[in-house]
């Protein structure tokens, strides 16, 4: 259980220092990160040449608005876009999708740390100032909206970040999340589902003719984990991916109930989780080896999701 299939211990150069990882996790898992120091921009990943070039002229595709949190924003994936406080990449999946579709117009208002209230009504604080509610970007002319949200609502990234273990002698932290027989994350998912439904309704009210797609979270870790390559107890690894699955399944149900679509990114990220060899990863681990924030998609992951989404949109769902 030292490493999952495809993992090579010798292929982990240039790991980000633990202190930087701690800063990034703090910045990415709270909306109010006004005082966080600027995060460094890492060098271009080896797969960057495969990314479609940004800056293309508007095409004949849909008028597109991308909403969501850091899973969509792709923090620290080159190049970082304005506003810098949102830690948003010009090569996140929304940008890849927009370029692949030849979007007639494109507004990427995703922002790391966003919760549902930041999409709907709250000016989200960032380290460079507040940004308007993301819903402000949606108009009656909008034809396509993608949304990735929910992880921060239930504090899943923050909880995962606090559960790193240096020894298997330390009890798994997932046991602490079940109190009196009630799973705290499961309870939060159910409690927030109405807010996600309300968000969809608000989008449909502003853009009645728009195609709305809720984009899920991926396969972050294989069931057995890969301790000690990634400092996650195998019990916690299985638990947290189960919670991601639970979140995705609930978002899928919300989409079905509200008459919109859900795009499941889990199948395409199987085998590309934090335990994969560095060149195969779509999601980085606690100490990224490709330019990305800890426990977030890298450039290859954003490219894969954006490309798959473009195929899905073009095929009509």
Describe these PLM feature segments:
Residues 17, 28-52, 56-57, 317:
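C-terminal region of N-terminal signal peptides and the immediate post-cleavage residues
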Residues 144-147, 168-204, 213-262:
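Conserved N-terminal glycine/acidic-rich loop preference
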Residues 63-68, 72, 105-110, 143-148, ...:
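Structural recognition of the beta-strand scaffold that forms the well-ordered cores
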Residues 46-113, 164-170:
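Serine-esterase "nucleophile elbow" of acetyl-processing enzymes
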Residues 77, 128-187:
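Oxyanion-hole/transition-state-stabilizing segment in secreted/luminal serine hydrolases
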Residues 1-30:
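Sec-dependent bacterial lipoprotein signal peptides
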Residues 113-132, 275-289:
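Charged, often glycine-rich, active-site loop that binds/positions anionic groups
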Residues 218-317:
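Catalytic His-Asp segment of secreted/periplasmic serine-dependent ester chemistry enzymes
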């Amino acid at each position: 259980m030292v490493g999952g299939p495809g993992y090579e211990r010798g292929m982990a150069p240039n790991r980000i220092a633990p202190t930087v990882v701690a800063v990034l996790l703090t910045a990415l898992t709270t909306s109010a990160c006004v005082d966080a120091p600027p995060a460094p921009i890492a060098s271009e990943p080896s797969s960057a040449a495969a990314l479609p070039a940004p800056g293309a002229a508007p095409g004949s595709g849909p008028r597109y608005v991308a909403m969501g949190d850091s899973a969509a924003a792709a923090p620290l994936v080159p190049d970082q876009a304005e506003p810098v406080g949102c830690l948003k990449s010009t090569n996140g999946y929304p940008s890849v999708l927009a370029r692949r579709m030849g979007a007639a117009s494109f507004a990427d208002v995703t922002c790391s740390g966003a919760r549902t209230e930041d999409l709907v009504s709250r000016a989200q604080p960032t380290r460079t100032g507040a940004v308007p509610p993301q819903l402000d970007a949606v108009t009656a002319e909008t034809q396509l909206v993608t949304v990735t949200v929910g992880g921060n609502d239930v504090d899943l990234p923050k909880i995962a970040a606090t559960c790193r273990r240096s020894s298997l002698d330390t009890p798994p932290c997932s046991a602490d999340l079940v109190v009196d027989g009630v799973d705290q994350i499961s309870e939060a998912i159910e409690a927030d589902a109405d807010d996600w439904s309300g968000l969809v309704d608000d989008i449909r009210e502003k853009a009645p003719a728009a195609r709305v797609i809720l984009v899920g979270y991926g396969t972050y870790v294989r069931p057995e984990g890969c301790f000690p390559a990634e400092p996650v107890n195998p019990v916690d690894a299985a638990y947290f991916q189960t919670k991601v699955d639970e979140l995705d399944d609930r978002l899928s149900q919300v989409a079905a109930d509200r008459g919109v679509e859900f795009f499941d990114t889990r199948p395409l990220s199987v085998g590309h989780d934090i335990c994969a060899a560095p060149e195969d990863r779509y999601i980085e681990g606690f100490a990224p080896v490709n330019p990305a924030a800890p426990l977030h998609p890298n450039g290859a992951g954003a490219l894969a999701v954006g490309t798959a989404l473009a195929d899905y949109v073009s095929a009509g769902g």
